[in-house]
Every structure is written in C-alpha cells, then in structure tokens.
Amino acid sequence: MSNHKDYRCYGLRLLTVTAVFLALIAGFNGFFDPYQVIGTPTIKGLNQVKREKDIQVRLFKAVAVNKIEAKSLFLGSSRTEFGLDTHHPGLSDLQPGYNLAITGGNMYEVRRYFDHAIATQPEVKEIILSLDFFMFNQAKKNTPDFREERLGTRNLFVGDLFEVLLSKPAFISSLRTLKNSFSRPNNPGFFYEDGRRNPDSTIEQVYFNQGVIPRFRMVLRDFLVRPDLYGTYQLSVDYLNDLNAVITTSQQRGIRLHLFISPSHALQWEAIRVAGLWSEFEAWKRALVNLSPIWDFSGYNSMTTEAIADPMQYYIESSHYRKELGDLVLNRILDYRPETVPSDFGILLTPTNLETHLEQIRRDRELWAQENPKWVEFVEALKP
C-alpha cells in the first residue's frame, strides 16, 4: 500500500511539474508572440520586432487579415509582397487594404487564401491578383507551412495554437524576438503592418547584404536549377482551374478583380528562354487570356530593361521589383495618373491582341539581346 501511495504521489508531482513547465513555456511564447498571431500587446525593447514572421508567412497572414475589415486585397507571390503598397492613392476609397500575397505560393494556395479572405471579409470590393509563370508549374507543390484547417475561419486552429505556444521552433523564435527587439528596437522586421515585405531586411538577412549582381546571380540560378520553378515545367490544368474559380467567384460576388503578369526584370525572361521554356511561357499566357483579360507587364519594355547597377531604382534582383515600380503598375491598372506610366509598360491582353503582343515581345527581345550581349551571356552561363 505504501509503495502504491509513493507512486501516486510521484505521478502527481510529475504531472504538476510538467503542467507548470508547459504553462511557463506557453506564457513565454504567448508574451513574445513571435509570429504575431496571439495579439499580445507589444512593448518596445521586448517583443515588438517580429522578424520571425518570415518563417510562418501563411499562418500570420491568415490571422492578420482577420483583424481588419478589409475592402481591398492584393494576392499573388512574393513579387506582390515586395512591390504592391495597399496605401496607393488609387485605392484611397478602399481602405483598409491588406497584402495577402504569400511567399512562393502556387495557384492553388493563392486560390485558398482568396477563399479565406472572402469567407471572413465580407466588405472586400476590389482584389488585385498578380500571376507568375512558376505558380502554374505542376511541380510546384504546396509549401510545408500551408494548412487548410486555418482557412475560412476567424478562429485560430488548434494545431496552430500548439505550434505558436508550445513548440520548440516557437520558443527559439521567441528568444530571437527578444534579442531583435532589444538590440534593434526600431527595425520593422521583414513585413510592414499591411503585409508588404520590407526589402531592406530581406537584402540584409536573405541576400546577406550582397550587391545587385550577386543577388541577380543567386536568384536566376535558383530558378534555373529548381524543378518547381524552371528546372522542369508542365503547365497545370488544375492550377488554371483554380484561377478560373477565383474569376468566377469574384464575378458572382460583385468583386472587381484585376489580373496582371508581374514586371520582373528582363533577365528573368532570359532565364525562361535559357531554360527552353519560351514556348511554354507563351502557351501559359494564351491559357490565361482564354479565361479573362489580363494586364501584361512582362517582356522587354522600358521599365523591365532597367540598367543593372548598384543601387537600382526599380528592382531588388531579377525576380522582385520595388514599390516604386509597383506604384506604376497600380497607376496603370487603376487608371490613376496614367500620364506617369510609360506607354509600353502594361498592355491589357485579350484574344484580339494577344498574338500581336507576343510577336512584339519577341522583336523587343532580339533588339535587347543585340544591345546587351553581356547580360545574355551572364544568364546562359548559369544554366546547369
């Protein structure tokens, strides 16, 4: 009997210690709230610099958009995250807005975040959706941090709650949040409050403060090597159907939906050519236009051929553009101060003008290549 009581007491003590330990961990992580999903008040010097949100983009954005009554949204990949500012004056009557683009997402993920937004944000009136070639690659699978369960609801998913409060990664992120908040209290981190990415933090932490040319080289090589980007490519019918679902639902809900192809730098289009995917690139545009008119900012126009120098006014590297260029994109799409936008930047594609436009891009590419053989060779040298 004595041994039984001893075991019972030991078990109770162990449970008590474990419960206290977990409560302390949960309290610690809840206070520092490294992914900014709990809603803990921020205290300067302790927990206000949330740089760790970058490792839980899909989680924190699903929660963040629920904290406002959004009237306008941006959707797409990290190109949209960097380039589009919700405070653009052309959207002044559609505030607040939120940049709900998700890093490296495929079209299915983008569709599901669209579904999430319209399920929880009944006031949304306008959506601007950026489309990228790689988003429609059959090999581009859902990212590991994508979870269906957190979408379509304003409540925090139980699995996410555990991840935020009790997981080892969250504890490490909380420690880093304390360190960053204490050592760099005025640093905004990777994201602004409206969901737009901070290019300065990205250049520092992701590109290790490298100059423009090393950044171009790093990104282009990545696109050429990775099978889910340009390494291999098969246009996904399923992803086209996901886009069509977004278009159809927007029409049914009376939401103004603007579609556009990102204005990456000319070297990004050279990477598509070097990868042997130019015909697939054009086939993708044809498939898009069959679904809806779409603004095309790609190609070799006066903006995408910006001279490569350090610093650059409009580009971070070949794939991602800055707010300065994003403002011109929005000027064109929203017909806001159209006189500020070069005439060759942004063409509304329809079945009527598509083939002429594709032919014009081929001619523009030949002229650009003749004038820039150094950069043609630069991209070709990166092919694995």
Write out the residue ranges for each language-model feature:
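Membrane-embedded segments
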Residues: 69, 75-163
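Active-site segments of SGNH/GDSL-like serine hydrolases
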Residues: 249-273
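Secreted/periplasmic serine-hydrolase-like ester/acetyl group-modifying domain
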Residues: 131, 140, 144-252, 344-384
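Alpha-helical transmembrane signal-anchor/signal-peptide segments
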Residues: 32-54
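Hydrophobic membrane-insertion alpha-helices, especially the h-region
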Residues: 12-33
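Small-residue-rich helix-loop
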Residues: 274-275, 279
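Short extracytoplasmic
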Residues: 47-74
